[in-house]
Each structure stands twice: as C-alpha cells, then as structure tokens.
Amino acid sequence: MENSQVWLLWGALSVAVLFYLSTLRRRHAGGKPLPPGPTPLPLIGNLHLAGGTSFHHKLRDLARVHGPVMTLKLGLATNVVISSREAAIEAYTKYDRHLAARATPDTFRACGFADRSMVFIPSSDPRWKALRGIQGSHVFTPRGLAAVRPIRERKVGDLMAYLRAHAGEEVLLGQAMHTGLLNLVSFSYFSIDIVDMGSQMARDLREVVDDIISVVGKPNISDFYPFLRPLDLQGLRRWTTKRFNRVFSIMGDIIDRRLAHIRDNKPSHNDFLDSLLELMAAGKIDRVNVLDMLFEAFVAGADTMALTLEWVMAELLKNPGVMAKARAELRDVLGDKEVVEEADAARLPYLQAVLKEAMRLHPVGALLLPHFAVEDGVEVGGYAVPKGSTVLFNAWAIMRDPAAWERPDEFVPERFVERAPLLDFRGKDAEFMPFGSGRRLCPGLPLAERVMPFILASMLHTFEWKLPGGMTAEDVDVSEKFKSANVLAVPLKAVPVLIK
C-alpha cells in the first residue's frame, strides 16, 4: 500500500474515533436523553450485534432489555429503533413530517437514483409530491387499475396453467409465484412477459433486476461510516452503477419501441406505460421519471408479493384446519364456478383474514424502509430522536406486540374477521402495518391488495395442496431469514393436486 493511502486510512480512523467519542451517550441539546441501548464498542458501535440471519429478531430481543425506543450505533451511524405499537403511534401521529425523509443506502446513490427516486427523496420535496400525485391519480387509481384488470386476470390464469402442467409434482412455490408475478407486473406496466419469453431483452432485464435485489441486503461500510462513502471501499456502488445503467438501457429500449408504436398510430396497449407516456407528452413528467417508476415497480412489486404469498402458503400447509376453512368459504361463495375472478376476492372475508394474519406474523418488510430525522424536536417515549439519525420501525415486533395482540406468536386468522373494519392495510393505528404508515405508505398498496388475495383464492380453488415426501404439517418449517427482506429460511415445496 502506498504511503499516501496509509496516511489516508489512519487519518480516516482518527476522525472516526474522535467523532465516536464526541457522540457517546450525550444528552440531546434540548435536554432530553437519547434512548437507551446496548453499550457501543469503540469504533464499531453495536455492529457486532447486527450479524446473523434474523436481525429483526435480535432487535426485538434487545428492545425487551432496553425498551421499545432504543438507540443502536452501527459504526458511526445513530439508529433509533421503535418496537412497540404505542411508540409507533406517537412517532407517526406527532412527527410524521419530521421523519418523512428516507435514510438512503449508498448502493442506491448509483446513477443519482436516490436523488430523484420517489422512494428516497423527502416528502417535503416538491418533486416527491408531484410524483406521488401522478401515481395516485394516473397509475394506482381505481380507474387505472380497472383498465388493466383483464391483464392481471390473464396473467394469473397463466400461473394457474403452469401449476396445472405440474399437478402431482413437487413445486418450489416461491419460484413459481415470483415468475408469475414478474410477468403480471411487467405485462401490466408495458405488455411484455419478462420470464419464459424468447427475447434476449426480457432475459437480460430479469437477470439484472435479480442482481440488484441481491445486493440490497449486503452490509456496506459506506453506510456505517458515511465519511468513507467517496472511497466506495467495497465497490458496491460501482457494481450497482453498471447494473443500473444496464436496466435503464433495456427499459429505455422498451420506451422507444412504444413511442414508435404510438407514432405509427397503432392501437393502444391500455397499460401503465401508455398512461405514463401520455403524461410525458403533456410535460408533466420526463423520460427519467418514467424509467424510475418502471424500475421501482420491478424491484419492489413482484418480489414483495411473491414472498408474501409463499409465507401464506407455508402457514396454510402448517395449519391444515385453516386451509380447510378457507377452501370451504371458497366453495360456499363461488359454488361450481371454475375460474376465480379478481372481484371475487372481496367476497371472501376469511381468505382475506388468512392473508392479513400471515402478513402480521411474517411481514416481508420486517423493518420497513428506514426513515431519517431531518430536524430536531422529535421525542418518542420521552426520549430525543436527534437530527441526522436513522429511525427503524421494527414492524415485525410491533405486529407481535403483546400489548396489542392476544397470543401474538400464533397463527389465528379469526382475529382479522372479528376486527375486519378496524384493521386494513393502511396502518392507521400502527397495530397492523405491513405496508408502513403515514405519508410514506407504500404507493403500490392498491395493486397489492387486489393481486394477492386474487392469486391466493385461485390457488386454493383450483388445487388441493399436499406436502412432498411424506412430510406432515408439523414438518413445515416457518423459520425466518432476513436478507434484503424477511424470507423463509427453507424455501417452500408443495404438490398441487388438481380438483376435478
């Protein structure tokens, strides 16, 4: 190593130590103490507690010792972890505006994505308000969703056809649903099947999106020691930049083909891309906005819904009595109807309860997307949340809070039947919040709450589901593993048996 690099490293470490010592257990300028937490070690803080496969479990265990509002030092980054419904309500109702910015992983700074993405820019930014308004009024409106409902029904039909072709065989359910949902999302947005499609473009797009998802959950020294970001020591931002450039190039080709289609006065595809290009033509958004929206839908939409449905099926196979009850409801409501339609799901309250209970127990976004305190003055549980800190809502722990739920660690869908009007997906009382709450509520919720019960109803109405290899319900492993999302530690395998 050259002398200049050695001195740079030692200088960086010296600054880190001084900065660390200056922040140790100090009281906030307003007089309120910072939340309690585990004693940080020199330089690394509490990073030694962050390893393993179930970070959200560790945070819940630490909260039992230090309290529902807790400080965690990850390197030099101050994190405030909220783990109870009461504390979450206080944070969302009193300080939604103060906490409405996002803590941005350095990986997503590649290509300037975080500086313009609706996922990361602060909600106080006029661009965020404009983009959120466009999604709410042109993409995820009842009218817009109704327009592409035939596409969704056709793609769910394709998924059922795939499962029929493999009836009686062992199927990796997560993989099958991920494939089906990638096609549903891609066809809804720009009328192209991404999986099992002959074009090289489709295969390249699927591969690069999978690559980007895989890097999201990797620990990055740039996030723990922000002053080291310019060095990108692990090369993760450079690696991601190459993938971003590739995915934006592929999606740019899709946009160019559609624009040529429009110039030739060919019939409309009646998908989300047509709606976005109409807005672009009117000057309300630009090409980069369209690219970002398409990318966000791919990275978040299909993956989250597929993982959720895998969790639901795991709990149903582990609880055959619940599955029998859900299938009985389907028979009572649908009778001899062979094919489930999307609108049928609204008439299936117990099936909806099954979905919600699985999401309560196993939220895919166990820690939601991290918030960022943009100003001082935030107090939660009597403690100061300092400006510049990352705020983590442990949704997994909050939705298992014994102060809010009876038998919180058990799979009991009936609780959502009894309290259905009070427990929707919007997290208003922070008791049930798989999609977050407040102004940063997941914008794709209107699509997800239509698609997931529709697919679940189709799977249970079309097939009986068996376990492979002599397994019993007790053998189903619902252990969790946290990477970029909360996933099954053991991928779920099951055998679809066609109902005659």
From Swiss-Prot:
Location in the cell: Membrane
MF annotations from Gene Ontology: ent-cassa-12,15-diene 11-hydroxylase activity; heme binding; iron ion binding; monooxygenase activity; oxidoreductase activity; oxidoreductase activity, acting on paired donors, with incorporation or reduction of molecular oxygen, NAD(P)H as one donor, and incorporation of one atom of oxygen
Keyword Transcription attributed: no
Induction conditions: Up-regulated by methyl jasmonate.
Keyword entries, A-Z: Heme, Iron, Membrane, Metal-binding, Monooxygenase, Oxidoreductase, Plant defense, Transmembrane, Transmembrane helix
Residues that bind heme: 442
GO biological process, one term: diterpene phytoalexin biosynthetic process
EC annotation from Swiss-Prot or TrEMBL: 1.14.14.112
Protein name as it appears in the record: Ent-cassadiene C11-alpha-hydroxylase 1
